[in-house]
């Protein structure tokens, strides 16, 4: 692989642009396409991720236009994916699912065997259609299809561990909520077309290049963590498409990769002066700028403040980003944005943040 040498400032500036933080994109589907999905575990955060990039709230695209699909994807968490790319993600997720193992500890925790889980997954594909079903209704239908009343307890658990394999195979996605009740539908029935995953080789290659195009330069360990499995498969992907990749050395540190088609653009980013990619940016919770890649986060978060950003139970805080670093965390309190600084900010930068937040005021703490 050809090698390019860049600085961290060039990297953070380039990544801000690739993540649509320096240009407005009104279409939430285009945002989801660029970002490799929009986080949707917390609905308000997903809306914020789209809106900070200039897009409309994704709800209309998801539930009315059906151009976005809400489903379990990376790391087994809910994301909004472009409906016309579901075959890509299903192909890669199905391949990931094929590598799962179910040790006795997993079976004890979830109350089913690996064989049971495969049967449940097949049954989900058989009973779901275009009519939304609640978790309770889906559990009852699966039990009836399999003749297994003993599955009532395991299927009722709130985290969906027994339903995620069906999502990976493209047999299940979220339907519109019924009040406070989540529902599920068949993606094929919901979209009115067959959903057949791409072959694993094609899908994995495309997922790797997509990730690097928006989060690179990154390591294969970064890819694996984002995708939700061990590093070995990501290393295989990188070896299989080595001709499409460029090695990147960042401030003398090697081990990073970027798509070869992006290498020239990355190297051309200026290292000095001011740049739109320097921010400031007020990013919502679970923003992809923070989530991936981890190798960037250890440079972006001030020493001793990792737990302010990545909190208990996997919660990723809303952050203030300045010059490629997390300068603070924030939350909303009525008509105020309360910013808790993790680093000192010049007065001019504070004024820029206040202008960015208008008409909402900023309370500095």
Positions of predicted regions on the chain:
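Short, cationic-aromatic polyanion-contact patches
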Residues: 84-86, 178-197, 255-270
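A short acidic, leucine-rich amphipathic alpha-helix
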Residues: 135-143, 166, 220-224, 324
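Positively charged, polyanion-binding regions of nucleic-acid-associated proteins
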Residues: 113-132, 200-216, 238
């Amino acid at each position: 692989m050809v090698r390019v040498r860049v600085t961290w400032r060039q990297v953070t500036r380039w990544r801000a642009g690739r993540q649509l933080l320096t240009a407005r994109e009104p279409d939430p589907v285009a945002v989801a396409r660029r970002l490799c999905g929009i986080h949707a575990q917390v609905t308000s955060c997903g809306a914020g991720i789209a809106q900070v990039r200039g897009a409309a709230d994704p709800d209309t695209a998801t539930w009315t236009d059906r151009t976005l699909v809400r489903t379990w994807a990376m790391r087994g968490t809910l994301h909004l994916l472009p409906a016309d790319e579901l075959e890509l993600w299903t192909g890669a997720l199905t391949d990931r699912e094929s590598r799962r193992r179910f040790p006795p500890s997993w079976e004890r925790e979830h109350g089913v065997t690996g064989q049971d889980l495969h049967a449940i997954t097949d049954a989900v594909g058989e009973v779901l259609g275009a009519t939304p079903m609640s978790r309770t209704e889906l559990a009852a239908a699966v039990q009836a299809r399999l003749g297994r009343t003993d599955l009532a307890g395991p299927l009722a658990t709130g985290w969906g561990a027994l339903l995620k394999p069906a999502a990976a195979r493209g047999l299940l996605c979220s339907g519109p909520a019924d009040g406070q009740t989540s529902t599920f539908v068949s993606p094929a029935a919901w979209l009115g077309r067959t959903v057949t995953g791409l072959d694993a080789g094609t899908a994995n290659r495309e997922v790797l290049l997509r990730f690097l195009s928006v989060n690179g330069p990154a390591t294969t360990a970064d890819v694996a963590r984002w995708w939700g499995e061990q590093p070995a498969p990501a290393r295989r992907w990188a070896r299989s498409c080595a001709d499409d990749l460029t090695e990147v050395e960042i401030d003398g540190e090697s081990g990073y990769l970027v798509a070869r088609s992006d290498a020239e653009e990355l190297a051309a980013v200026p290292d000095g002066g001011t740049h739109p990619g320097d921010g400031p940016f007020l990013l919502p919770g679970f923003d992809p700028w923070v989530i991936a890649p981890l190798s960037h986060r250890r440079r972006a978060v001030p020493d001793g403040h990792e737990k302010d950003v990545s909190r208990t139970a996997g919660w990723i805080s809303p952050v203030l980003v300045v010059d490629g670093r997390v300068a603070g965390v924030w939350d909303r309190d009525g008509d105020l944005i309360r910013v808790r600084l993790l680093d000192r900010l010049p007065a001019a930068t504070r004024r820029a943040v206040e202008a960015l937040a208008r008409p909402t005021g900023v309370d500095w703490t």
